[in-house]
Amino acid sequence: MGGTKLTHVTTTNPNNSNIHGPVVDEVEGLIKVYKDGHVERSQLLPCVDPSLPLELGVTCSDVVIDKLTNVWARLYVPMTTTKSSVSKLPLIVYFHGGGFCVGSASWLCYHEFLARLSARSRCLVMSVNYRLAPENPLPAAYEDGVNAILWLNKARNDNLWAKQCDFGRIFLAGDSAGGNIAQQVAARLASPEDLALKIEGTILIQPFYSGEERTESERRVGNDKTAVLTLASSDAWWRMSLPRGANREHPYCKPVKMIIKSSTVTRTLVCVAEMDLLMDSNMEMCDGNEDVIKRVLHKGVGHAFHILGKSQLAHTTTLEMLCQIDAFIHHYDPLN
């Protein structure tokens, strides 16, 4: 799609309360839902076209997945050299975070992070711009993820970038709500039919899970108003994204246990942030599954540090995480 920007941006209007009635749910500064169902999103983070500096060694373009649902993806493809072009590269299918309700594959923070991930890990990356709740409550995002994989299955022989891709080595990845989506998509593809590709593993960065009973890390971090994710915002994201009438005991709020022991998805990397209210739920999903799950705890950093953190610690830890993901994909010890 070249430089075409496919994302839709909704801006705020101070008169909306008069037109659409009172606000019935919101996450301050990010999203408001009005009584008549109108949804207003604030664009706090800039959206960018699919362009990258030449020196990064990665090309970028947007592709349409489904015209009817307006689902699209941003592709990052490492530039080949004479030395590297002999072997094909793994593919990471990535789902952005945002509580299922906000976010875009064109957000600058994701664009920069995934370009670095592609360059560092020597992988193609496909960042999926899925449908958002509350207009499209779950499982819409899960369905879009599955459709993105089915699109890959059809596109593998029709695109120049596909010639560089090893479709036998696909990793489903995402952060926060995107980590939840990645695992749900993997579960839905646990018994694939007519797929000429293989999901080798999942990479879950601070995956978004919850429950009605509060965890210790939720009580410890959840009321920190400086945190990216608070208890108030976490609860609001779930209210706006779950099927009508569901609470936080719904299966969508829990890790998919069947996929952890799946014979088709053989490996999982879980990246946990110490200062994240999700820490306990992320650690718990790994307990007893050490044979198939590699758990990495990033100390001193909070939720979404890898895309929103501005401190030197966040920057250094992001570099470490990129190295850990690279090591997980390519089977080596990052400390050696």
Curated annotation (Swiss-Prot):
Region (Disordered): 1-20
Biased composition (Polar residues): 7-19
Key words, A-Z: Hydrolase, Serine esterase
Active site: 176, 276, 303
Motif (Involved in the stabilization of the negatively charged intermediate by the formation of the oxyanion hole): 96-98
One Pfam short name: Abhydrolase_3
A GO BP annotation: cellular response to hypoxia
InterPro entries per UniProt: AB_hydrolase_3, AB_hydrolase_fold, Carboxylest/Gibb_receptor, Lipase_GDXG_put_SER_AS
Enzyme class of the recorded protein, top EC level: hydrolase
SUPFAM superfamilies for the chain: alpha/beta-Hydrolases (SSF53474)
Tissues expressed in: Expressed in roots, leaves, flowers and siliques.
GO molecular function, one term: carboxylesterase activity
EC number: 3.1.1.1
Reactions it catalyzes: a carboxylic ester + H2O = an alcohol + a carboxylate + H(+)
Transmembrane segments: none
Record-stated family: Belongs to the 'GDXG' lipolytic enzyme family.
Function field: Carboxylesterase acting on esters with varying acyl chain length.
This protein's name: Probable carboxylesterase 6
Organism ancestry: Eukaryota, Viridiplantae, Streptophyta, Embryophyta, Tracheophyta
